[in-house]
Amino acid sequence: MNYLKHKFYNLLTTIIVLFIFVLSGAIFLTFLGFGLYGLSRILIYFRLGDFTYNRSMYDNLLYYGSYIIFGYFIVFAVEHLMDYFRKMLPENAYFRGATFHLISYMVATTLFYFIIHLNYVYINIDFWVIMVIIGFLYVCKLQFYPESKNLNNRK
């Protein structure tokens, strides 16, 4: 009987944690969706972008969502690869300071444009607009998630 009590407690704890995870993920995706909808409206208003894919809600969600997910994957992969290079080559001048951030930003933007953006024919945004958007996001990442020491390393 005691075994069943602990099993129920573990199951209840798992369900609560899963509920919190799903709820926070849903809230994040909702805010992301509203933010991207607002960004697309701003780009359309200033004639900086054109979004001509207009099917059903789920088709639009899949098309534009995959654009965002693939773009995020490219930027994420470039950042981690550049961090890996910086750790492997600490004396190299290209992997220090502003030069490192400029190279990371340019590589991520260029790869995003040629690998992701050119394959989505219904999204028409100029390269310089993509550079400004990714540059703004990169500066926000540097501001809100600065490089810091690994606090888990104990000497």
Curated annotation (Swiss-Prot):
Cellular component annotations (GO), alphabetically ordered: plasma membrane
| UniProt keywords, alphabetically | Cell membrane, Membrane, Transmembrane, Transmembrane helix, Transport
Subcellular localization(s) per the UniProt record: Cell membrane
Q: How does it sit in the membrane?
A: Multi-pass membrane protein
Asked if the keyword Metal-binding belongs to this entry, the reply reads no
Please, which domain of life does this record's source organism belong to? Bacteria
UniProt feature coiled coil, ranges:
none
Assign the protein's first listed, main location to one coarse class.
membrane
Looking up Pfam families in the UniProt record yields: SepA (PF17080)
Q: Where are the transmembrane segments?
A: 15-35, 61-81, 98-118, 120-140
- Could you tell me which InterPro entries the record lists for this protein? SepA (IPR031396)
What family is this?
Belongs to the multidrug resistance efflux pump SepA family.
Q: What does this protein do?
A: Involved in multidrug efflux.
For this entry, the protein name equals Multidrug resistance efflux pump SepA
Species for this entry: Staphylococcus aureus (strain MRSA252)
Gene giving rise to this polypeptide: sepA
